[in-house]
Structure formats: C-alpha cells, structure tokens
Amino acid sequence: MKHIRNFSIIAHIDHGKSTLADRLIERCGGLADRQMQAQVLDSMDLEKERGITIKAQTAALQYQARDGQVYQLNLIDTPGHVDFSYEVSRSLSACEGALLVVDASQGVEAQTVANCYTALELGVEVVPVLNKMDLPNADPDNAKAEIEDVIGIDATDAIPCSAKTGMGIDDILQAIVAKVPAPRGQADGPLRAMIIDSWFDSYVGVVMLVRVVDGRLLKGERIKMMASGAVYNADGLGVFTPANEPRDALAAGQVGYVIAGIKELQAAKVGDTITLEKKLPNNAGPAAQALPGFKEIQPQVFAGLYPTEASAYDSLRDALEKLKLNDASLHYEPEVSQALGFGFRCGFLGLLHMEIVQERLEREFDQDLITTAPSVVYQVVKADGQVLMVENPSKMPDQGRLSEIREPIVTVHLYMPQDYVGPVMTLANQKRGVQMNMAYHGRQVMLTYDMPLGEIVLDFFDKLKSVSRGYASMDYTFKEYRASDVVKVDILLNGDKVDALSIIVHRSQSQHRGRAVVAKMREIISRQMYDVAIQAAIGANIIARETIKALRKNVLAKCYGGDITRKRKLLEKQKAGKKRMKQIGSVEVPQEAFLAILQVQE
C-alpha cells in the first residue's frame, strides 16, 4: 500500500487539465502509441468539444521514481464545473493529493478556487503546478502570488510545466511521489469501498468506479450497498490504465471498477459505500458504518422539455431513460401542458447541466425539443401551515391561499480584474444581490453576494460575461430558503391562461417583466380575423395588455356616397360575424413564443 498514490487534477476550464493528463499517461506508458489520442480521458464528443470534463475517469499508471522504486499512481480525473460540484467532492475524497493546475498566463479562476477549497476541507494535499509556460505571455511570478493570495497555500515551489511541449512532466510525477501521502486504511479490515462514479454499459450493465478504502474485494464475492441495502454479485473487477484491464482482486488503496450485473444507475449512487454481504471464513465480514460524505443530489433548476411533434413523445421518453442510465443527477417526470401537449418536467443540477442534457438529446438521440423557461424550486407555506415545494409555475396555488413564498438563496463568489468591479456590482444589484464581502487579491477582486437562484438561472451568467468582457468568473453554492415577495405572472390570450408561459418573479419586477413578455408576444402571434387581447395578470389584476388588431375587409368599398344607415348596416353585419368567429376560434401560439420568454431582456 505504501507504493500507491491516488491523486486528481483541479483546474479551471481550458487551463490544460486533460492535456496534462494525456502527458502523464504517455510518460508512464499507460497506453500503446497507437491508442494514444488527444484528451484520452474525455470520452464523450461533447466533452471534447466544449473542452470540459463531465464524467470522472481514471487511469492507473506505473511510474518508476528516481530512487528506482516503482509506484502505482492512480489519476482520478474530476469534472471542473460548478454544476458538478458533488461529483468533484466524491472524486477528491477518493484521493490523498491533488495537482492544482493554474494557467500561468491567466492566473486563478473562480471554479479552481471553489474546487481547491473543497480539496483543502477534505484534507487533500494540494500540489501547485503552473501550466502553459511555453506561452510568450506566461507570468509565473504573478500566478504564484495569486495562488498564495487567493487560495492561501504556499506556492514558492510550484512546478513550472507545459503539457503541450511535455516540459516539467517528470518533475510533476516526482512531486506526486514525494508530497502526496500514501493511502491510509486497514488492509485486513472489513471491506469499505466508495463509489466515485458509475456509468451504464449496454453489454455488462452498470460499471462502478470505486476506491477501496479498507479491506479487499475478490471476484465473485457478494457485495452490499450501504445506502440502499441491495445485494449483488461482484462478477468482474479490474483497473483502467485508461484501457480496462481485468483483475481478480482489488486491495485497500486501489482504484478500479466493479461490475455486478446491476440494471439501473439508481442502484449505484455516487458516494455510496460498498461492503460485503456476510462474514465468511476467508473475509473480514461487512463494515459497521459507511464512509462519510454521502448525500442524495437534489436538482436545483427545472425546465419542461417537449417534443416538437406529438408523435415523438415515446422516443423522447426512451432518450431520457438512456441518458438517465449515465447521469443519475437528471430527474424527469411526465407533464402535460395545454399549449405544448405531452412532455417532461426535468430537474438539473444547474444551467450548464441543462444545456448539456439538451445538447446530448438533440445530438445523440436526434430529438427536436422545445424547452420552457428554466425555473427554480420555491418553498410555499399555505395558510394552514402546510409546506409545499413548487418547481413549476403552473402548479403554484392562488396567492389568496398562501401565507408566504420562500425562494432559494445562493452564495455567489465572483472573481474579476479590478477594472470591472463597477459594472459587475451594478449587475449584481439589479439581480437583487446583497453584498456580503469584497476582497482584493493583487489585481483580482473577489466579491461575495447572497442572491436569489431564480435571478441567476435566467441570464446572469451571460450578462456577467458581457459586462466584464469575459474576464469575470463565478461559482455558487446553495445557502437557504428565504421568505420573499414573489408573485406568479400569468399570460392570458383572449382571457385564456397559457400555462407554459407563466413565470414567477419578484413583485418589484413583475410589471416590467409582464410588459416585456406581452410586447414580445404581440410581435410573434400572427393577426387573426378578430382582435386578440394579450394580457399579463397577477391573480385577477391585469398588469399589462397589448391588442393585436383584427384583419378586416373594407366592406364600405362599394358604397358611393349615399346614406349613413346603409354603411352602418354593413359594418354591424361585419362586426357580428367577427364576434361569432371569436367565440369559436382559438389562437395558435407558435413555438417561438416559448423561446421568446427566455429572451425577454431586462
């Protein structure tokens, strides 16, 4: 066990994490030359394209250190984005060390800091690495100062390297051996292994990526999940070098995979502990308590997904089922909307997660989708004291029957160069943010705000990037539910509610948003043979209205002069016809209307 090192790489998007991983694998001869390709660990096309890592991957590498001893290095690749923070914390808790990769030309970014704090809280040894030293504008001294300032760890001996040219790779491997502690655990105690990640393979079922903490697991043993109590047979074990390599046993300190004939991903939850079912002569029996840190993931952002063709409902359901096999944090349930027909209400971890799910549905499963405006979960307290969680604006009870509505508040950390502090603060105040802290680190500023999640979900990230010319970065963590004056705004067409267009907003912005939506709808809905009234209402109060004028034929064209009563008769006749039409006609709401809600600019 003392020759094993488990480590992961922490880095902001585009700071060169996956390329560095490629170099480490190449240097240790993890793959034959013909199997080597760029970004070996990012197996999904979408991961390569967006340059982000979504699922955790691992590689077990053999490295001969300078003292001649061969070490087994387990690289656990972590997702870097704030939406996947739970997966990051699981990956990190499976390691004893982490390489903190910072782009020498850009310095420290928000998500790096968030993940680095997670690592420090878990007691992981952090080794700073300055990447992209081959760039002409690399500024290692400034990057070191930022690491010390912002994160507060000693960066004097940060390792300079360039993953692109391969410089400094040996120094990194040597530092891992020297600085990262060996795994602690009882090699002969009861088996405890943590699930770092799991994914679905159509051939063998669910594959679990595990880190064995105590004891050992032999092929063919009966294993038990401690969170659910389910029992399975460990049919296959092995390690990834990134290519998979079967083994007969996994011992304490090792990272490998377990295949146990599990049919659905729900059964293998990330963070759960695996132990043995019962004591037998050749093993130490089941563990008394699970490893700490497991929690069920709760979705934060909800949106409706509907097929553009009603006939595609079944294929959308199949696509969601298949996605769910590989993404346990995706929640969905069937939903019916008067305007859009049959579809699903889906829950996501955050906005990036939502975009990725949509993109994978469209790309891998050829689905054409309409997505309703994203909304967050509100806590609603009814007059009789009953507390409901409402994730869909159309399910919100009438204002009259409620005593209060609480909205989710998150703590947001914003990092930016000091030139952009003004515009960013203005933006945060517009979004009802309350400033909690402000700290200067060299040329970088860190602002901390408490802000409603509902405001962030709409377009905060895009706005933040535009007011800071792309330099600001952010991450957020859920804080609490707080009572707030939010109201539900309904959109009516000729007096009929269109459920999919309802929005929940703060009362101070309800007029403004209501007007904006109504004006947008007026541009989109085509003219009918009768007047169409578009209204925004809070309960029974109409707060905004636009009218689409009717198309009408000029019935007076054939009257030359003559009596006014003759003209009046023709006009009355036309009016009666329009009135009859209005009673039986219904207004078609085009698809663009639902997307327009998303684009209503502040």
Swiss-Prot record:
Q: Which CDD domains match?
A: EF4_III, LepA, lepA_C
Q: Which SMART domains match?
A: EFG_C
SUPFAM superfamilies registered for this protein in UniProt: EF-G C-terminal domain-like (SSF54980), P-loop containing nucleoside triphosphate hydrolases (SSF52540), Translation proteins (SSF50447)
**What cellular-component terms does GO give this entry?**
plasma membrane
Catalyzed reactions: GTP + H2O = GDP + phosphate + H(+)
Write out the annotated subcellular location.
Cell inner membrane
Task: Specify the tr-type G domain's residue ranges.
Answer: 2-184
Which EC number(s) does UniProt give?
3.6.5.n1
Q: Which GO terms describe its molecular function?
A: GTP binding; GTPase activity; guanosine tetraphosphate binding; ribosome binding; translation elongation factor activity
* Keyword terms: Cell inner membrane, Cell membrane, GTP-binding, Hydrolase, Membrane, Nucleotide-binding, Protein biosynthesis
How is it placed in the membrane, per its record? Peripheral membrane protein
Question: Briefly, what is this protein's role?
Answer: Required for accurate and efficient protein synthesis under certain stress conditions. May act as a fidelity factor of the translation reaction, by catalyzing a one-codon backward translocation of tRNAs on improperly translocated ribosomes. Back-translocation proceeds from a post-translocation (POST) complex to a pre-translocation (PRE) complex, thus giving elongation factor G a second chance to translocate the tRNAs correctly. Binds to ribosomes in a GTP-dependent manner.
Protein name (database record): Elongation factor 4
Organism whose genome encodes this protein: Verminephrobacter eiseniae (strain EF01-2)
* Protein encoded by which gene: lepA
